[in-house]
Amino acid sequence: VLLIPEIDMPGHSAAFVQAMGHDMQSEEGMAILKQLLDEICELFAELPYLHIGTDEVQFTNPRFVPEMVAYIRAKGKRVISWNPGWIYQPGEIDMTQLWSYRGKAQPGIPAIDCRFHYINHFDTFADLIGLYTSRIYDQPQGSPDLAGAILAVWHDRLTLPETDLIRTNNLYPNLLALAERTWLGGGFQYFDQFGTCLPLDPMDPAHQAFVDFERRMLYRKAHDLPDYPFAYVRQTDVRWRITDAFPNEGDLARVFPPETALQPSYTYQGKTYGSREAIGAGIYLRHVWGTTVPGFYAEPQENHTAYAWTWIYSPQAQEVGAWIEFQNYSRSEKDLPPRQ
């Protein structure tokens, strides 16, 4: 395990301003920050990397980032920076971490792919399919310009007990999926092309690969991690039928034909609405990242109603638990309330 400490600078630093009384990019702030870097580099003397952030900020001092990179490098450490962030030329930074869809790897600068890897935004089941099947930065293998990938979980909210962060964000299954993909390379298409829907054809290579991964992962859950909060059960045997979306014109109480009979297709107001199969315990009708990541509907529209059904077999009469999850605007952020 390689620990990479990060001090985000000069952005995400309101606490620094409040505590020190100076903006990080000011002369006084830079002097204080260098003292903090002295302590950090001493504390983590055996670690080769230090991450300096540089994301989501307005730069007011053009000296700031180059001077901080040079200061840290002079202490024998290699420096990582977010991309998008400060713009570097080869040789000016040791590695970049691509944090958003706008982040692009640059020739001559090793990059870490993190663009679709924020598991606090993930559905427990659907995004695991996308994570496992996706190529790293849409490349089949690593290279001098592609160092690998990182999985992120932003735990901005105070969560007690802390183990709930691992459980609700499905850490271990996602960790195993990305670990195998980065170790072996390969994959099928990138997240923004493949999406999160498992192919229906059992002979499809992506279908077969995920079924095999799931089998091996559940073995590890049972034999290596039986006492860990491993929030996953088999989903490749779960089949749904989902209708085309009916226009409700904003009336969520409007009733459509599937409420009276379950059929392969329906005629409503002179138009035919079909239905299709889907596999998995979590199905995105529209992905949390919109049409950037494909979901069940190729062109999802507002003010529509969809119907989905499946069958559950039990060999005997019994009471069992139900695992029900809906989009929750990320388990990290406190903003983004639904429109009224």
What are these language model-derived features?
Residues V1-K75:
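Substrate-binding cleft of carbohydrate-active enzyme catalytic domains
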Residues P5-M9, N83, R115, I324:
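Glycine-rich, histidine-containing beta strand-loop boundary motifs that form or position
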Residues E299-S314:
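Short beta-strands within extracellular/lumenal beta-sheet-rich domains
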Residues E56-F125:
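C-terminal active-site-proximal or functional interface alpha/beta core segments in diverse enzymes
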Residues R215-P294:
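Accessory carbohydrate-binding/adhesion or oligomerization-edge regions at the termini
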Residues Y313-Q340:
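Aromatic-lined ligand-binding clefts that engage carbohydrates, nucleic acids, or primary amines
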Residues S100-D237:
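Flexible, acidic glycine-rich loops studded with aromatic residues
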Residues L2-I4, L47-H51, R78-I80, I93-Q97, ...:
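Structural preference for beta-strand elements that scaffold enzyme active sites
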